[in-house]
């Protein structure tokens, strides 16, 4: 099964998960980056991301290459910002026009996921959502996170 992992990660947690899934499933990886990505303090990131969620801003992305029709399974992962999936995924989904595909979703968070997965699924309407997962601080969680990622990814490969 040809698989793609699409990920946006600001602090590295979602990239950590995506890299593990890529390795386990021999998948292609597409890393999304905003055009104005900058190093900010933790509070600066909180304000920047929370502001985008609050005001419904879809940030511009750096160019990426992805052809949905080339894949049987598309796995997407983003951090949770203000109880929602990070806005860069909205920009991506608007442009990529993914429809009728098998989709698996994951989010990374620091302790509160809110309705992020519910909102993420709504953004992917018109697709078959086959799995979802949330990973709490996967980099800090070490072996426990690695086991959770492995178990989830293996379930996708069936």
Describe each region flagged by the PLM.
Residues 1-76, 83-85, 90, 94, ...:
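N-terminal beta1-alpha1-beta2 submodule of the flavodoxin-like/Rossmannoid cofactor-binding fold
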Residues 26-28, 128-131:
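Conserved beta-strand segments of alpha/beta enzyme cores
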Residues 71-72, 100-101, 127:
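Short, well-ordered alpha-helix to beta-strand connector turns
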Residues 76-77, 105:
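Redox-cofactor binding/interface segments in oxidoreductases and associated redox assembly factors
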Residues 94-100, 124-125:
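Short, conserved loop/helix-junction motifs that constitute active-site signature segments
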Residues 107-112:
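Short beta-alpha junction loops
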Residues 116-125:
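Short, aromatic/basic amphipathic alpha-helical patches
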Residues 130-158:
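Glycine-rich phosphate/pyrophosphate-binding loop and the adjoining helix
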């Amino acid at each position: 099964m040809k698989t793609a992992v699409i990920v946006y990660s600001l602090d590295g947690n979602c990239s950590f998960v995506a890299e593990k899934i890529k390795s386990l499933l021999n998948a292609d990886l597409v890393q999304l980056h905003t055009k104005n990505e900058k190093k900010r303090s933790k509070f600066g990131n909180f304000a920047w991301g929370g502001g985008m969620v609050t005001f419904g801003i879809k940030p511009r992305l750096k160019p990426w290459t992805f052809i949905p029709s080339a894949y049987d399974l598309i796995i997407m992962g983003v951090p949770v910002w203000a109880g929602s999936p990070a806005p860069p995924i909205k920009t991506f989904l608007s442009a990529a026009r993914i429809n009728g595909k098998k989709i698996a979703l994951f989010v990374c968070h620091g302790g509160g996921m809110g309705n992020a997965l519910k909102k993420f699924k709504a953004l992917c309407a018109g697709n078959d959502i086959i799995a979802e997962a949330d990973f709490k601080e996967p980099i800090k969680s070490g072996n426990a996170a690695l086991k959770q990622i492995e178990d989830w990814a293996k379930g996708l490969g069936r």
